[in-house]
Amino acid sequence: MKIVIQRVKSASVSIDGVIKGKINQGFLLLVGVEDADSNFDLDYAVRKIAQMRIFSDEADKMNLSVQDIQGEILSISQFTLYAETKKGNRPSFSAAGKPDFAKAMYEKFNDSLAQIVPVKAGVFGADMQVELINDGPVTIILDTKEARKNA
């Protein structure tokens, strides 16, 4: 899994002008799945995201997790994170997970994360409009392939 984690003051997702999910302070996640992903990747990502300390404490040090601040998460499926750009000018997305598998993993990821932190989500495969107010900005890329290699 590749996940872009953005610390936000607020974020929302709309489809055809209708807001489908909206959060206040927390994380906006752009979530990509590849066919090699497994429950290991899913569990690793959920644990890392829930415990990642990138919110400021009273000393203005990044020391608090999304749980600590009672934040929320907006999760958006994003197959384009697996774009291959080495050849030509049009990206290939063949490295992205097959739609049925990716949808199941994305939904399981959201369900697992929602047991820890409130989660709102976009609609898998939909054309969505995402609005956010970055906080910092703080943006982190989590690639579970690295953890899988070391497991």
Swiss-Prot record:
One of its GO terms (cellular component) is cytoplasm. SUPFAM superfamilies: DTD-like. Its EC number is 3.1.1.96. Keywords: Cytoplasm, Hydrolase, RNA-binding, tRNA-binding. It is found in: Cytoplasm. GO terms for biological process: D-amino acid catabolic process. It is an enzyme of class 3 (hydrolase). Gene3D superfamilies: D-tyrosyl-tRNA(Tyr) deacylase. A motif (Gly-cisPro motif, important for rejection of L-amino acids) lies at residues 136-137. GO terms for molecular function: D-tyrosyl-tRNA(Tyr) deacylase activity; Gly-tRNA(Ala) deacylase activity; Ser(Gly)-tRNA(Ala) hydrolase activity; tRNA binding. The keyword Repressor does not apply. InterPro entries: Daa-tRNA_deacyls_DTD, DTD-like_sf. It catalyses: glycyl-tRNA(Ala) + H2O = tRNA(Ala) + glycine + H(+); a D-aminoacyl-tRNA + H2O = a tRNA + a D-alpha-amino acid + H(+). The keyword Cytoplasm applies. A Gly-cisPro motif from one monomer fits into the active site of the other monomer to allow specific chiral rejection of L-amino acids. Homodimer. An aminoacyl-tRNA editing enzyme that deacylates mischarged D-aminoacyl-tRNAs. Also deacylates mischarged glycyl-tRNA(Ala), protecting cells against glycine mischarging by AlaRS. Acts via tRNA-based rather than protein-based catalysis; rejects L-amino acids rather than detecting D-amino acids in the active site. By recycling D-aminoacyl-tRNA to D-amino acids and free tRNA molecules, this enzyme counteracts the toxicity associated with the formation of D-aminoacyl-tRNA entities in vivo and helps enforce protein L-homochirality. Belongs to the DTD family. This is D-aminoacyl-tRNA deacylase. The gene is dtd.
